[in-house]
Amino acid sequence: MGRRPWQGVKYMSVIKELLSELALKIKYYNPSDYPHLKDGMKFNIRGTAYIFIDIFNSEKVTQNILLHEIGHVSFGHRHLDCRSSGWDRRQEREADRYMIQHRADEWLAQFDWEPDVIDYDKFIEYFELEKRHYGLVVEVFDEIIGQPQLHSHCL
């Protein structure tokens, strides 16, 4: 497992700061060498918490995974074998929301003023999010801006 430098990614410094505050370290892995690992898996090894990331991910996907996992930690989520699938979905949604909120803040920071319309499809494509996040993206932007936006596909 090797390390990968973060060249030219200014937002990564925010993520690294959050990881440091939460005492989390990143470990990169090659899935062909470690087929049992999955992106974003968190393990404690000798008292240090590691998040495992596939070396073939793009930088944006890696950042999304890290923000999602930081969301789990910041919400105090714990892995319990006996928890219900409803509890699991709730925790995943909270972690996804955390990641999308950070991405929405980053997206809105590019504008000098609040945009009249948010192009959700463009946002999802830019940050390489999965289409399943569309509804949550809409919710997050509606909360941030304080009013429902026209959906970009309605324009």
Task: Give residue spans per PLM region.
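Active-site hotspot residues in diverse enzymes, especially metal/ion-binding acidic/histidine motifs
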Residues: 1-155
